[in-house]
């Protein structure tokens, strides 16, 4: 993986993007947070090399995220699932965690195609073009990730004492609200915010940014 740091000082926030995120999109969740934001670029994204064969496994991605020293973390979709896996093996790893649009917890879900991801992309034409170009590198991920779970048994997350904010969408077939609800419920200090939009990172970007700033401020 590649990491890039923005800002300076503490706290240090790890930022883990979703599948097919463009470089600019990957930075969005942490914009406005104080301290240092360390944005991870996973293989086959941005200027990172293509993923090695068999890479797309939540455990392997979690291990890569675990190499970044940080006080707190934000993950989106695939990144959220990898953070959940990391917390399952290191429950005291972070002081606070935000999980945006989790796609899976401990129950398997149906497959998805890159065409589905492309068709669900909305926004300005330049962004849509960048997103579709990013997805073109991810055929292996689309073949390997469906059927996987973030954790085999969500009950292990009861060992996580840190506050965890889960932000879910309503009407997003790839990020079901039931998964967001189950994820928030799995953490003793979990908090759920369901946004009535299938694409809250676009329709409610300002509100999400303000909520994250407030959450990490404690």
Task: Identify the residue ranges that each predicted region occupies.
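Catalytic active-site module of serine/aspartate enzymes centered on a nucleophile-bearing elbow/loop
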Residues: 190-218
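Flexible "cap/lid" loop of the alpha/beta hydrolase fold
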Residues: 81-123
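Conserved alpha/beta-hydrolase "nucleophile elbow" surrounding the catalytic nucleophile
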Residues: 17, 71, 75-80, 169
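Active-site loop/oxyanion-hole signature of alpha/beta-hydrolase fold enzymes
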Residues: 39-72
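Conserved alpha/beta-hydrolase "acid-adjacent" motif
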Residues: 173-179
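Hydrophobic, aromatic-rich cap/lid helix
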Residues: 127-155, 171
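Conserved HGGG/HGGXW glycine-rich cap/lid loop of the alpha/beta-hydrolase fold
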Residues: 2-49
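Short beta-strand/loop motif that positions the catalytic acidic residue
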Residues: 160, 166-168
């Amino acid at each position: 993986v590649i990491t890039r740091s923005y800002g300076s000082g503490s706290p240090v926030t790890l930022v883990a993007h979703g599948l097919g995120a463009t470089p600019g999109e990957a930075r969005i969740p942490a914009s406005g947070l104080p301290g240092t934001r360390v944005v991870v670029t996973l293989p086959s994204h941005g200027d990172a090399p293509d993923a090695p064969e068999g890479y797309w496994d939540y455990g392997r991605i979690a291990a890569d995220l675990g190499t970044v020293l940080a006080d707190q973390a934000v993950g989106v979709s695939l990144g959220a699932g990898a953070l959940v896996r990391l917390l399952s093996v290191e429950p005291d790893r972070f002081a606070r965690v935000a999980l945006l649009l989790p796609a899976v917890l401990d129950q398997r879900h149906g497959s998805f195609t890159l065409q589905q991801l492309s068709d669900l992309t909305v926004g300005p034409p330049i962004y849509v073009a960048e997103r579709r170009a990013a997805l073109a590198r991810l055929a292996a991920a689309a073949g390997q990730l469906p059927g996987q779970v973030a954790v085999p048994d969500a009950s292990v997350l009861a060992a996580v004492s840190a506050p965890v904010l889960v932000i879910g969408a309503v009407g997003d077939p790839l990020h079901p609200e039931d998964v967001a609800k189950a994820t928030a419920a799995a953490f003793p200090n979990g908090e759920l915010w369901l946004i009535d939009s299938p694409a809250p990172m676009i329709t409610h970007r300002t509100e999400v940014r303000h909520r994250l700033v407030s959450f990490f401020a404690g």
